[in-house]
Amino acid sequence: MKEFISILISFIFMSLADSIDSAFNNLISIDAIVVTGSFLLIDYIFKSFAEIGIYTYRTTRKNEWQYLWFNIIFGILMGIIVLTCKNLIVNIFNLSDTQKNMLSILLNFYAIYVVFGRLANGIFEIIRLKGQLKLYRKSLIVYYVSLIALDTFAYLFTKNLTLLFVATIVSWLISVIYMLYNLKLKFELPNKNSLKNVIKYGFAYSSERLLSRIFLLLYGVIASHMGTEKYGIHTVCYSVCLTLEIITNAYQAALMIKVPEGKTYIEQYNNCINMRNKCFPLIIALNFVFTFIYLVISHGSLPLNKCFPYIIFYSLGVFGLYPYETYKTLCISQGKSFILLIGSTIGVIIRFLICLLFLNTPFALFVFGIVNFIDFFSRSIVYRIVLSKLCKKGNFSI
């Protein structure tokens, strides 16, 4: 429980700082809101394989630099793909010419954005998985103080969306230097064994993330056809929804520290269930309190009243995310990443079909909110069923 509280405090600090960062983007204009939302959807897809190294490390827990290199290599590859396909990607969304031009400019330096972002994220996670929570908190402070200071400068003197994204990249670089200096990881290049582990564990995990995020992109693309105002409402509400995930992510991060203490599947399962029962009331309460805090901070140029009552339906996603994170952790600790792929496939297809069905109805925004719960709860059911069957067949050490 103490790990959860410590990580939760760090994650709440992160979410508030991220909301302030988003607010700078959103204050520029409604075009900036739409472009930022579209850019983040693109990033969610392409960073799936740019995080393949750290996905593998979650299971192996050794040879840190070898897996960080895979983040860097795949980040460069993803950046090249985005730059090559830039015109095609920009035209996926139903954007105005001004919005397309703004998005095109951001995609020009996506390779740098994704490499530094995934490297920083990988090192942050390594520190957390090692249980070095004091260094983790200090590193977060370094990153966010740099980010907000640079954001403030860029907004006050330029109000340029591109420079706000450059501020993020520079802040990542500063935090990477700070963390590597203090962590003192043994420098290693990838070898045949780490490559095998990436193929065995990381590839299925990255594929699951990619598939899930492709359907989330389609989710955003479908939403863009509701018109600029409704898409703007969706973008703000969904960005709040994504920020709220930081609470359940803190819960899952604590599980990733505690669950491996169990030597058998049954012990790990019991660790998960005990943690779940202890944390549930606190997570639900925080979810709804911070829903309104994040909304007030990040609504930007969109009138606050236009987000009601839709934001309530978007925030219900926590009831699906909570069991999802619980059983996902068990899949990772047991090295069964293929289960994640199966569950996500089912969940995202359900999300996509429901949104498509209700797109042109008067209550489309309500549906686009509630499908977050339906998607993740469906995944958790699949994870639980498959894990149970594998356990009964003796596929785990019980």
Regions found by a protein language model. Give the residues of each.
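Signature of the first transmembrane helix
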Residues: 1-51, 203-226, 239, 376
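Interhelical loop/hinge segments that connect adjacent transmembrane helices in multipass membrane
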Residues: 1-4, 99-102, 161-214, 390-398
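Hydrophobic faces of transmembrane alpha-helices in multi-pass small-molecule transporters and flippases
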Residues: 1-16, 107-111, 134-141, 178, ...
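Alpha-helical transmembrane segments of multi-pass membrane transporters/permeases
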Residues: 7-8, 62-69, 126-153, 165, ...
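Small-residue-rich hydrophobic transmembrane alpha-helices
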Residues: 26, 33-78, 121-128, 231-287, ...
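Alpha-helical transmembrane segments of multi-pass membrane proteins
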Residues: 38, 97-123, 244, 301-327
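Short membrane-interface helical motifs at transmembrane helix boundaries
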Residues: 77-104, 282-309
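Hydrophobic alpha-helical transmembrane segments
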Residues: 138-153, 157-185, 365-389
